[in-house]
Amino acid sequence: MFALCDVNSFYASCETVFRPDLCGRPVVVLSNNDGCVIACSAEAKQLGIAPGEPYFKQKERFRRSGVVCFSSNYELYADMSNRVMTTLEEMVPRVEIYSIDEAFCDLTGVRNCRDLTDFGREIRATVLKRTHLTVGVGIAQTKTLAKLANHAAKKWQRQTGGGVDLSNIDRQRRLLALIPVEDVWGVGRRISKKLNALGIKTALDLSEQSTWIIRKHFNVVLERTVRELCGEPCLELEEFAPAKQEIVCSRSFGERVTDYEEMRQAVYSYAARAAEKLRGEHQYCRFISTFVKTSPFALNEPYYGNSAAVTLLTPTQDSRDIINAAVKCLDKIWRDGHRYQKAGVMLGDFFSQGVAQLNLFDDNAPRAGSAKLMEVLDHLNAKDGKGTLYFAGQGMSQQWAMKREMLSPRYTTRYSDLLRVK
């Protein structure tokens, strides 16, 4: 038995948690460089605002409608997500973190001692009490059915109270008949068009199809979906995310970059951040790549995009090694006279910690005290906020940095941003 817990309007809700004065007001969160809408509160959705709308086109409309806009505050969202997931892990045997705002919970054995509907309400109430975030809870025998139960819990929140137990077969069929096939987890628009052409309009229609025919005309993934809709678990709970095969750190610049020194600072920063992520995965890498590009949509400007890579003989997780390699790559591809829109650093060819081997022919031997130095660096930045300790090459002003002109405070991760109660 699975429960899918999904935070309602997560990004927007994180902003309103610390701003009770925004209760009942439309709130939107913008993408990198305040480009377009990526999240809306329920009040904003009622005004017809949808994700993907460019901010510069809607700015005047937002002002007239009293819409409150925020730049993306990823540090706040990550910490609030961690609080939600920690709460869930205390309440259920196992948890699979599916995304920043949703998780699958293992309810094996719970129904033997608890009513599942009551338990779903308890999960919802506990998360609300600890984080002031509202979650929808969908309970069913399979992940796909739990997704649909969660969809119903959020769509008909007033009738369901934010939680739906879909373990009853008759209730399953009634709900499946109401759900368009394109809303089924894993179906998507392209496949739904083919299904509609075959007369398969709803989730119930799909569940009644022969698995053999579905596999023959589509694929094994859709066959699993059909089996899951019929209550046959095909997707197991994954407590541990598979090891990453690569790490990419890149951003579009707040302003076009034309100066080499500014680009070098950006590559320094991206490489340092990528190295930090690498250590967080307890991995070493040998492959480091840097890319730069101009905007393909800029009028009367030639497009230029290029990348270069370095393969180290000895795997490393030291920020200094990764930064040096990334800057060498930049030197190979930098061309004067362009207005660069974006750059990034990619790491690959990973080795697990303790498995990486030295190379006799490598001139760059591992640095003495490297592991301890990186540990101190990560500890201070985790404790006092990202960027507390940084490399001089990253620069101080960082005029190229991503625009976040409406950034809210990092209420939960920076002492300087703690709320003051009067």
Where are these predicted regions, by residue range?
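Gly/Gly-Pro- and Ser/Thr-rich, intrinsically disordered tail segments characteristic of DNA damage-repair
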Residues: M1-R227, E236, A365-K422
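A generic structural signal for short beta-strands and their flanking turns/coil linkers
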Residues: C23-R25, L133, Y284-I288, N306-A308, ...
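Short Gly/Ser/Thr- and Asp/Glu-enriched loop/turn motifs at secondary-structure junctions
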Residues: Y98-E102, A140-K143, Q283-F287, H338-K342
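Short, hydrophobic beta-strand segments
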Residues: A103-G109, S307-L313, A356-D362
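Short, internal active-site loops enriched in acidic
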Residues: G109-V110, T142-A146, V292-A298, G348-Q353, ...
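DNA-contacting surface of Y-family translesion DNA polymerases
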Residues: D183, I191-R339
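Short conserved micro-motifs at the rims of enzyme active sites and ligand-binding pockets
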Residues: E301-Y303, V355-N359, M402
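C-terminal hydrophobic structural anchor segments
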Residues: V327-K383, G387
